[in-house]
Amino acid sequence: VTEAVYLIERMIDVLAQKIGVDKAEIRRRNFVRPEQFPYTTGFGWTLDSGNYHAALDKVLAAVDYEGLRREQAAKRADPACPTLMGIGLSTFTEIVGAGPTKVCDILGIGLFDSCEIRVHPTGGVIARLGTMTQGQGHATTYAQIIASELGLPASDIVVEEGDTDKSPYGAGTWGSRSTPVSGAATAVAARKIKAKAKKIAAHLLEVGEGDLEWEIDRFQVKGRPGAFKTMKELCLVSHTGNLPAGMEQGLNAVAYYDPPNLTFPFGAYLCVVDIDKRTGETAVRRFYALDDCGTRINPMIIEGQVHGGLTEAFA
Protein backbone atom coordinates (compact mmCIF):
# COMPACT_ATOMS: atom_id res chain seq x y z
CA VAL A 1 0.00 0.00 0.00
CA THR A 2 2.79 2.43 0.90
CA GLU A 3 4.50 2.01 -2.45
CA ALA A 4 1.23 2.42 -4.34
CA VAL A 5 0.36 5.59 -2.44
CA TYR A 6 3.83 6.98 -3.12
CA LEU A 7 3.44 6.40 -6.86
CA ILE A 8 -0.01 7.99 -6.98
CA GLU A 9 1.05 10.98 -4.89
CA ARG A 10 4.10 11.63 -7.05
CA MET A 11 1.91 11.50 -10.15
CA ILE A 12 -0.47 14.03 -8.60
CA ASP A 13 2.45 16.32 -7.70
CA VAL A 14 3.82 16.17 -11.24
CA LEU A 15 0.38 16.91 -12.66
CA ALA A 16 -0.03 19.88 -10.31
CA GLN A 17 3.31 21.29 -11.45
CA LYS A 18 2.51 20.84 -15.14
CA ILE A 19 -0.88 22.57 -15.00
CA GLY A 20 0.17 25.20 -12.46
CA VAL A 21 -2.19 24.24 -9.64
CA ASP A 22 -1.17 24.03 -5.98
CA LYS A 23 -0.66 20.45 -4.82
CA ALA A 24 -3.21 20.82 -2.03
CA GLU A 25 -5.81 22.36 -4.32
CA ILE A 26 -5.56 19.66 -6.99
CA ARG A 27 -6.18 17.02 -4.35
CA ARG A 28 -9.13 18.91 -2.92
CA ARG A 29 -10.75 19.19 -6.35
CA ASN A 30 -10.54 15.46 -6.94
CA PHE A 31 -11.59 14.10 -3.55
CA VAL A 32 -14.79 12.12 -3.17
CA ARG A 33 -17.20 14.57 -1.55
CA PRO A 34 -18.81 13.73 1.83
CA GLU A 35 -22.30 13.64 0.33
CA GLN A 36 -21.18 10.99 -2.19
CA PHE A 37 -20.69 8.32 0.49
CA PRO A 38 -21.21 5.42 0.39
CA TYR A 39 -19.12 5.61 -2.77
CA THR A 40 -18.47 2.74 -5.16
CA THR A 41 -15.10 2.88 -6.89
CA GLY A 42 -14.32 1.86 -10.44
CA PHE A 43 -13.04 -1.46 -9.07
CA GLY A 44 -16.36 -2.18 -7.38
CA TRP A 45 -15.34 -1.51 -3.77
CA THR A 46 -17.78 0.49 -1.66
CA LEU A 47 -16.19 3.13 0.57
CA ASP A 48 -18.62 3.45 3.46
CA SER A 49 -17.67 6.87 4.82
CA GLY A 50 -15.08 9.61 4.85
CA ASN A 51 -14.46 13.33 4.90
CA TYR A 52 -11.26 13.87 2.98
CA HIS A 53 -11.77 17.61 2.57
CA ALA A 54 -12.03 18.15 6.33
CA ALA A 55 -8.91 16.06 6.95
CA LEU A 56 -6.85 18.05 4.45
CA ASP A 57 -8.16 21.40 5.66
CA LYS A 58 -7.32 20.53 9.27
CA VAL A 59 -3.73 19.68 8.37
CA LEU A 60 -3.24 22.80 6.24
CA ALA A 61 -4.64 25.04 8.96
CA ALA A 62 -2.53 23.41 11.68
CA VAL A 63 0.76 24.09 9.89
CA ASP A 64 -0.19 27.46 8.33
CA TYR A 65 0.19 26.07 4.83
CA GLU A 66 -0.16 29.43 3.09
CA GLY A 67 2.56 30.87 5.32
CA LEU A 68 4.85 27.94 4.51
CA ARG A 69 4.29 28.44 0.80
CA ARG A 70 5.20 32.12 1.08
CA GLU A 71 8.36 31.25 2.99
CA GLN A 72 9.28 28.64 0.40
CA ALA A 73 8.76 31.09 -2.47
CA ALA A 74 10.93 33.71 -0.74
CA LYS A 75 13.77 31.22 -0.22
CA ARG A 76 13.65 30.09 -3.82
CA ALA A 77 13.78 33.69 -5.01
CA ASP A 78 16.85 34.46 -2.88
CA PRO A 79 20.03 32.98 -4.44
CA ALA A 80 21.96 33.80 -1.27
CA CYS A 81 19.67 31.67 0.92
CA PRO A 82 21.78 28.77 2.29
CA THR A 83 18.90 26.31 2.47
CA LEU A 84 16.25 24.80 0.26
CA MET A 85 12.80 24.21 1.69
CA GLY A 86 10.54 21.32 0.73
CA ILE A 87 6.88 20.79 1.56
CA GLY A 88 5.65 17.23 1.10
CA LEU A 89 1.92 16.48 1.12
CA SER A 90 0.23 13.11 0.97
CA THR A 91 -3.43 12.16 1.23
CA PHE A 92 -4.55 8.55 1.10
CA THR A 93 -7.24 5.99 1.63
CA GLU A 94 -5.95 2.63 2.80
CA ILE A 95 -7.65 -0.67 2.06
CA VAL A 96 -7.50 -2.90 5.14
CA GLY A 97 -9.31 -5.78 6.78
CA ALA A 98 -8.94 -8.45 4.09
CA GLY A 99 -11.39 -9.72 3.50
CA PRO A 100 -14.75 -10.84 2.26
CA THR A 101 -14.54 -14.45 1.12
CA LYS A 102 -16.73 -13.68 -1.89
CA VAL A 103 -13.94 -11.55 -3.38
CA CYS A 104 -10.79 -12.30 -1.37
CA ASP A 105 -10.43 -16.08 -1.34
CA ILE A 106 -6.92 -17.43 -1.89
CA LEU A 107 -6.85 -20.77 -3.72
CA GLY A 108 -10.38 -21.37 -2.51
CA ILE A 109 -9.58 -20.52 1.12
CA GLY A 110 -11.69 -17.71 2.54
CA LEU A 111 -10.13 -14.91 4.55
CA PHE A 112 -12.46 -15.12 7.53
CA ASP A 113 -11.05 -15.30 11.04
CA SER A 114 -12.17 -16.79 14.30
CA CYS A 115 -11.97 -16.48 18.05
CA GLU A 116 -12.58 -18.96 20.84
CA ILE A 117 -13.36 -17.61 24.31
CA ARG A 118 -13.53 -19.65 27.50
CA VAL A 119 -14.65 -18.04 30.76
CA HIS A 120 -13.57 -19.55 34.07
CA PRO A 121 -15.80 -19.70 37.17
CA THR A 122 -13.58 -17.01 38.71
CA GLY A 123 -14.25 -14.56 35.88
CA GLY A 124 -10.90 -15.11 34.24
CA VAL A 125 -10.92 -15.45 30.46
CA ILE A 126 -8.82 -17.26 27.87
CA ALA A 127 -9.17 -16.12 24.27
CA ARG A 128 -7.54 -18.01 21.41
CA LEU A 129 -7.11 -16.55 17.94
CA GLY A 130 -5.51 -17.49 14.65
CA THR A 131 -3.49 -14.30 14.30
CA MET A 132 0.04 -13.68 15.56
CA THR A 133 1.30 -10.44 17.01
CA GLN A 134 4.37 -8.80 15.50
CA GLY A 135 4.49 -5.89 17.91
CA GLN A 136 1.05 -4.45 17.18
CA GLY A 137 -0.24 -5.06 20.70
CA HIS A 138 -2.76 -7.80 19.90
CA ALA A 139 -3.01 -9.06 23.47
CA THR A 140 -3.92 -5.61 24.74
CA THR A 141 -6.36 -4.88 21.92
CA TYR A 142 -8.23 -8.19 22.06
CA ALA A 143 -8.37 -8.09 25.85
CA GLN A 144 -9.85 -4.60 25.74
CA ILE A 145 -12.51 -5.72 23.27
CA ILE A 146 -13.53 -8.59 25.55
CA ALA A 147 -13.38 -6.42 28.65
CA SER A 148 -15.61 -3.83 27.02
CA GLU A 149 -18.16 -6.42 25.93
CA LEU A 150 -18.26 -8.50 29.12
CA GLY A 151 -17.44 -6.00 31.85
CA LEU A 152 -14.55 -8.13 33.12
CA PRO A 153 -11.10 -6.68 33.93
CA ALA A 154 -8.70 -6.72 30.99
CA SER A 155 -5.99 -7.81 33.43
CA ASP A 156 -7.89 -11.10 33.94
CA ILE A 157 -7.99 -11.89 30.23
CA VAL A 158 -5.30 -14.09 28.67
CA VAL A 159 -4.88 -13.96 24.89
CA GLU A 160 -3.23 -16.91 23.14
CA GLU A 161 -2.07 -16.74 19.53
CA GLY A 162 0.12 -18.64 17.14
CA ASP A 163 -0.36 -22.18 18.42
CA THR A 164 -1.98 -24.10 15.57
CA ASP A 165 -2.68 -27.05 17.90
CA LYS A 166 -4.92 -24.89 20.10
CA SER A 167 -5.97 -21.81 18.18
CA PRO A 168 -9.00 -21.78 15.89
CA TYR A 169 -8.45 -21.37 12.18
CA GLY A 170 -7.51 -17.93 10.92
CA ALA A 171 -5.94 -16.33 7.87
CA GLY A 172 -3.19 -14.75 9.94
CA THR A 173 -1.65 -11.37 10.51
CA TRP A 174 -1.10 -9.30 7.39
CA GLY A 175 -2.71 -6.47 5.47
CA SER A 176 -3.84 -4.59 8.60
CA ARG A 177 -6.56 -7.19 9.13
CA SER A 178 -6.11 -8.37 12.71
CA THR A 179 -8.37 -5.88 14.47
CA PRO A 180 -10.99 -5.46 11.71
CA VAL A 181 -11.41 -9.21 11.23
CA SER A 182 -10.08 -11.10 14.27
CA GLY A 183 -11.11 -8.24 16.54
CA ALA A 184 -14.62 -8.44 15.12
CA ALA A 185 -14.66 -12.21 15.66
CA THR A 186 -13.60 -11.55 19.25
CA ALA A 187 -16.47 -9.12 19.77
CA VAL A 188 -18.99 -11.54 18.25
CA ALA A 189 -17.80 -14.40 20.47
CA ALA A 190 -17.97 -12.17 23.54
CA ARG A 191 -21.51 -11.12 22.64
CA LYS A 192 -22.58 -14.76 22.42
CA ILE A 193 -21.31 -15.24 25.97
CA LYS A 194 -23.02 -12.06 27.09
CA ALA A 195 -26.32 -13.22 25.60
CA LYS A 196 -26.14 -16.51 27.51
CA ALA A 197 -25.20 -14.69 30.70
CA LYS A 198 -28.27 -12.49 30.28
CA LYS A 199 -30.51 -15.56 30.18
CA ILE A 200 -28.93 -16.79 33.42
CA ALA A 201 -29.36 -13.38 35.05
CA ALA A 202 -33.02 -13.22 34.05
CA HIS A 203 -33.55 -16.70 35.49
CA LEU A 204 -31.90 -15.82 38.80
CA LEU A 205 -33.69 -12.48 39.14
CA GLU A 206 -37.01 -14.05 38.08
CA VAL A 207 -37.69 -11.52 35.34
CA GLY A 208 -37.84 -11.61 31.57
CA GLU A 209 -34.75 -10.83 29.51
CA GLY A 210 -36.50 -7.71 28.25
CA ASP A 211 -36.68 -6.44 31.84
CA LEU A 212 -32.89 -6.31 32.12
CA GLU A 213 -30.45 -3.62 31.09
CA TRP A 214 -26.67 -3.75 30.88
CA GLU A 215 -24.67 -1.40 33.09
CA ILE A 216 -20.87 -1.58 32.77
CA ASP A 217 -20.34 -4.99 34.40
CA ARG A 218 -23.80 -6.21 35.35
CA PHE A 219 -27.35 -6.93 34.29
CA GLN A 220 -29.81 -5.00 36.41
CA VAL A 221 -33.60 -4.90 36.46
CA LYS A 222 -34.93 -1.78 34.79
CA GLY A 223 -36.06 0.72 37.40
CA ARG A 224 -34.57 -1.38 40.21
CA PRO A 225 -30.84 -0.62 40.35
CA GLY A 226 -30.49 -2.70 43.51
CA ALA A 227 -31.60 -5.86 41.72
CA PHE A 228 -28.69 -7.06 39.62
CA LYS A 229 -26.21 -9.80 38.86
CA THR A 230 -22.63 -8.94 38.01
CA MET A 231 -20.86 -10.68 35.19
CA LYS A 232 -18.39 -12.15 37.66
CA GLU A 233 -21.26 -13.66 39.66
CA LEU A 234 -22.74 -15.10 36.49
CA CYS A 235 -19.41 -16.69 35.58
CA LEU A 236 -19.50 -18.70 38.80
CA VAL A 237 -23.19 -19.54 38.55
CA SER A 238 -22.78 -20.76 34.97
CA HIS A 239 -20.52 -23.54 36.25
CA THR A 240 -21.99 -24.33 39.65
CA GLY A 241 -25.43 -22.83 40.08
CA ASN A 242 -29.07 -23.14 39.14
CA LEU A 243 -29.42 -22.67 35.38
CA PRO A 244 -32.52 -22.39 33.18
CA ALA A 245 -33.97 -25.73 32.10
CA GLY A 246 -32.05 -27.28 29.25
CA MET A 247 -29.09 -24.91 29.43
CA GLU A 248 -25.58 -26.35 29.42
CA GLN A 249 -23.04 -25.28 32.00
CA GLY A 250 -20.26 -22.85 31.23
CA LEU A 251 -19.72 -19.62 29.35
CA ASN A 252 -17.82 -20.50 26.21
CA ALA A 253 -18.16 -19.39 22.62
CA VAL A 254 -16.55 -19.64 19.20
CA ALA A 255 -17.19 -17.12 16.45
CA TYR A 256 -16.17 -17.05 12.81
CA TYR A 257 -16.24 -13.65 11.16
CA ASP A 258 -16.30 -13.17 7.40
CA PRO A 259 -16.30 -9.39 6.87
CA PRO A 260 -18.98 -8.06 4.50
CA ASN A 261 -16.58 -5.42 3.17
CA LEU A 262 -13.09 -4.06 3.60
CA THR A 263 -12.51 -1.02 5.78
CA PHE A 264 -11.19 2.24 4.38
CA PRO A 265 -9.32 4.44 6.88
CA PHE A 266 -7.89 7.63 5.45
CA GLY A 267 -5.42 10.35 6.33
CA ALA A 268 -3.47 13.43 5.35
CA TYR A 269 0.24 13.93 6.11
CA LEU A 270 2.42 16.99 5.63
CA CYS A 271 6.19 17.26 6.08
CA VAL A 272 8.44 20.32 5.97
CA VAL A 273 12.16 19.76 5.37
CA ASP A 274 15.14 22.10 5.14
CA ILE A 275 18.10 21.09 2.96
CA ASP A 276 21.54 22.64 3.27
CA LYS A 277 22.57 23.67 -0.25
CA ARG A 278 26.25 23.14 0.46
CA THR A 279 26.25 19.83 2.31
CA GLY A 280 22.93 18.32 1.26
CA GLU A 281 22.08 17.67 4.90
CA THR A 282 18.34 17.30 5.37
CA ALA A 283 16.47 18.27 8.53
CA VAL A 284 12.80 17.56 9.20
CA ARG A 285 11.40 20.77 10.60
CA ARG A 286 7.77 19.75 11.00
CA PHE A 287 5.62 16.70 10.43
CA TYR A 288 1.86 16.65 10.85
CA ALA A 289 0.04 13.32 10.60
CA LEU A 290 -3.73 13.01 10.59
CA ASP A 291 -5.40 9.60 10.48
CA ASP A 292 -9.06 8.65 10.69
CA CYS A 293 -9.10 4.94 11.49
CA GLY A 294 -12.62 4.77 12.90
CA THR A 295 -13.14 3.53 16.46
CA ARG A 296 -9.91 3.66 18.45
CA ILE A 297 -9.71 0.69 20.80
CA ASN A 298 -6.37 1.72 22.30
CA PRO A 299 -5.23 5.25 21.33
CA MET A 300 -1.68 4.69 22.64
CA ILE A 301 -1.16 1.69 20.37
CA ILE A 302 -2.42 3.68 17.40
CA GLU A 303 -0.09 6.57 18.17
CA GLY A 304 2.78 4.13 18.54
CA GLN A 305 2.10 2.66 15.11
CA VAL A 306 2.05 6.14 13.55
CA HIS A 307 5.31 7.02 15.30
CA GLY A 308 6.87 3.77 14.10
CA GLY A 309 5.81 4.40 10.52
CA LEU A 310 7.22 7.92 10.58
CA THR A 311 10.49 6.64 12.03
CA GLU A 312 10.79 4.13 9.19
CA ALA A 313 10.19 6.91 6.67
CA PHE A 314 12.84 9.13 8.26
CA ALA A 315 15.32 6.24 8.31
Predicted regions and their residues:
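Cofactor-binding beta-sheet edge motifs in enzyme active sites
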Residues: 1-54, 61, 67-315
